[in-house]
Curated annotation (Swiss-Prot):
Location of N-acetylmethionine modifications: M1
One Pfam family recorded for the sequence: Ribosomal_L30_N
Encoding gene (name): RPL7
Official protein name in the record: Large ribosomal subunit protein uL30
Renumbered residue ranges of the record's region 4 X 12 AA tandem repeats: 7-54
Disulfide bond residue pairs: none
Gene Ontology biological-process entries: maturation of LSU-rRNA from tricistronic rRNA transcript (SSU-rRNA, 5.8S rRNA, LSU-rRNA)
Species for this entry: Bos taurus (Bovine)
Subcellular location field: Cytoplasm
Function of the protein: Component of the large ribosomal subunit. The ribosome is a large ribonucleoprotein complex responsible for the synthesis of proteins in the cell. Binds to G-rich structures in 28S rRNA and in mRNAs. Plays a regulatory role in the translation apparatus; inhibits cell-free translation of mRNAs.
MF terms (GO), sorted A to Z: RNA binding; structural constituent of ribosome
Residue numbers carrying N6-acetyllysine: K124
């Protein structure tokens, strides 16, 4: 009996340092699990918010379209012509090289971020930007993009400027990190801000890298001739959407 008791006494106790390590490890594991759970809940809440926003925007776009149709019908009924509101958004595509052009033209193309042939950018239309477009009109094709064009360009060709690098917009988190402070956290927010020319259009547009479009299917007709004369250059109004389809 005495020998057995002596053996029991001789069993080495767990060192305090090991106990402390185990306790710290257990606490760390709990913290990690809590953080993981919190992140999961945050992702779930964000997905729900993005879904609700997309639903709201869809309703808003449908309402805008219906209002246009109703106004046109009312004008026809009264025997008048319906004149839509002045477009606020343009999509501009560079279609020619600039060898031998004036420094002014070169500078305007740089300001429009059209450094290469078949680069495209969104432009907010106002007096100053329209004057800029007139200066470089022989070198660009431009017009008024519809919702489908804005949507397809951003989803298919959209790249963001993140840390001065061209990054594909494959995840809403990339948008949220760069534009979250402006309330733009997903692709639908970005599309809405561009299409409606919202208060944060400048930030949203500067975030988007200039679009690199393909050579148009079927080729160009006459790059040096204006669109109204059967060429490719200049303002083609809503016909820009056809060109976007051929190049996207």
């Amino acid at each position: 009996m005495e020998g057995a008791e002596e053996k029991k006494k001789k069993v080495p106790a767990v060192p305090e340092t090991l106990k402390k390590k185990r306790k710290n490890f257990a606490e760390l594991k709990i913290k990690r699990l809590r953080k993981k759970f919190a992140q999961k809940m945050l992702r779930k809440a964000r997905r729900k918010l993005i879904y609700e926003k997309a639903k709201h925007y869809h309703k808003e776009y449908r309402q805008m379209y219906r209002t246009e149709i109703r106004m046109a019908r009312m004008a026809r009924k009264a025997g008048n012509f319906y004149v839509p509101a002045e477009p606020k958004l343009a999509f501009v595509i560079r279609i020619r090289g600039i060898n031998g052009v004036s420094p002014k033209v070169r500078k305007v193309l740089q300001l429009l971020r059209l450094r290469q042939i078949f680069n495209g950018t969104f432009v907010k239309l106002n007096k100053a930007s329209i004057n800029m477009l007139r200066i470089v009109e022989p070198y660009i094709a431009w017009g008024y993009p519809n919702l489908k064009s804005v949507n397809e360009l951003i989803y298919k060709r959209g790249y963001g400027k993140i840390n001065k690098k061209r990054i594909a917009l494959t995840d809403n988190a990339l948008i949220a990190r760069s534009l979250g402070k402006y309330g733009i956290i997903c692709m639908e927010d970005l599309i809405h801000e561009i299409y409606t020319v919202g208060k944060r259009f400048k930030e949203a547009n500067n975030f988007l890298w200039p679009f690199k479009l393909s050579s148009p299917r079927g080729g160009m007709k006459k790059k040096t001739t204006h669109f109204v004369e059967g060429g490719d250059a200049g303002n083609r109004e809503d016909q820009i959407n056809r060109l976007i389809r051929r190049m996207n």
